[in-house]
Amino acid sequence: MFSEIQEKIHSGEGITFQEAAYLSKAENLDILQILSMAAQVTANFANKKIDLCSIVNAKSGSCSEDCKFCAQSVYYATGCQTYPLLNSVAILEAAKRVEEKGIHRFALVTSGKNLSNRDFDEVIKIYQVLREKTSLQLCASLGLLDTSRALQLKKAGVSTYHHNLECAESFFKRICTTHTYQQRVATIKSAQSAGLKICSGGIISLGETMLQRLELAYELKALGVDSVPINVLNPILGTPLAGQQIMSSQDIIKTICLFRLILPTISLRFGGGIKESLGELRVLGFPAGINAVIIGNFLTTTGYQIDRELSVIRSMGLNIS
């Protein structure tokens, strides 16, 4: 079946679920074949260009939801830093620092199921300031969203809405019971209806099977998202997943390869947990399919220093787009 899949890849097609399931069983030398196929697709799509974005944790902690991986949930004692919505001065300062580093995309991320009307109105004002005082492409990750709010974000200058599915629908109730998978899907569709691009992916190594990872990839494909962040669980003390065993580096790279073969023309973005799970092996993620990176710190965990990561990316002959 390898040769048949290779022919399909040459024609620019994504692979089927059955083909992905077959490749997912590969071990050792066969993984190198999968990596080679994924590298070919990545080269054709990305042309050695890397899209970089950075985020600011604009409102932290006190989240009403019970996502079992999250340090910000009120259900778990994690010692997470808690603070209300940052003001426009603090956020503009963070945005300017990002822009000075040559990063062109910036997102506000807020904790909670969604924002109160008061906080949402304030966020709209903040985006208006960012649009006037920076040249950054603006993204938002504000929880559940309806079409009315999506249209307001679009008008304020936001181009992309981020809202992860987190995992396959068949696994979702294992990690969250306070809202439904369909509410997440509805948020994505609301943002799309307002003309926003969609950044949506998930977290791997939550305890799901490889087939459920593939299920997530095909659900994202069906939704027509534009960018897929791939996060690896970083177990947080105090959460129910604190003792969860993390996948091997080999399985993480194989998963990235399969996502690239399933989603040949969608940006695959390194998200959180990469530093802890892959370390220096993260460089293998780029030929495997990664053509975008969330750079800098995350919500409650630290990433690689921006200057160091930029140096690594450039040393691989990749161009920042």
Curated annotation (Swiss-Prot):
Q: Give GO terms for biological process.
A: biotin biosynthetic process
Cofactor: record remark:
Binds 1 [4Fe-4S] cluster. The cluster is coordinated with 3 cysteines and an exchangeable S-adenosyl-L-methionine. Binds 1 [2Fe-2S] cluster. The cluster is coordinated with 3 cysteines and 1 arginine.
- Chain residues that bind [2Fe-2S] cluster: 139, 199, 269
Q: Which cofactor does it need?
A: [4Fe-4S] cluster; [2Fe-2S] cluster
Show where the Radical SAM core domain sits: 45-275
Report the coiled-coil segments: none
Which Pfam families does UniProt cross-reference here?
BATS (PF06968), Radical_SAM (PF04055)
Q: Quick one: which residues bind [4Fe-4S] cluster? A: 63, 67, 70
The GO terms describing molecular function are: 2 iron, 2 sulfur cluster binding; 4 iron, 4 sulfur cluster binding; biotin synthase activity; iron ion binding
InterPro entries the record matches: Aldolase_TIM, BATS_dom, Biotin_synth/BioAB, Biotin_synthase, Elp3/MiaA/NifB-like_rSAM, rSAM
Stated EC number for the protein is 2.8.1.6
Identify the metabolic or biological route this protein is part of. Answer: Cofactor biosynthesis; biotin biosynthesis; biotin from 7,8-diaminononanoate: step 2/2
Q: Which CDD domains match?
A: Radical_SAM
SUPFAM superfamilies in the record: Radical SAM enzymes
- Keywords of this protein's UniProt record, alphabetized? 2Fe-2S, 4Fe-4S, Biotin biosynthesis, Iron, Iron-sulfur, Metal-binding, S-adenosyl-L-methionine, Transferase
What is the reaction catalyzed?
Answer: (4R,5S)-dethiobiotin + (sulfur carrier)-SH + 2 reduced [2Fe-2S]-[ferredoxin] + 2 S-adenosyl-L-methionine = (sulfur carrier)-H + biotin + 2 5'-deoxyadenosine + 2 L-methionine + 2 oxidized [2Fe-2S]-[ferredoxin]
PROSITE patterns, per this entry? RADICAL_SAM (PS51918)
Question: Enzyme group, top EC level?
Answer: transferase
Quaternary structure per UniProt?
Homodimer.
Q: Which family does it belong to?
A: Belongs to the radical SAM superfamily. Biotin synthase family.
Q: What does this protein do?
A: Catalyzes the conversion of dethiobiotin (DTB) to biotin by the insertion of a sulfur atom into dethiobiotin via a radical-based mechanism.
Its recorded name reads: Biotin synthase
The species this protein was found in: Desulforamulus reducens (strain ATCC BAA-1160 / DSM 100696 / MI-1)
Gene label: bioB
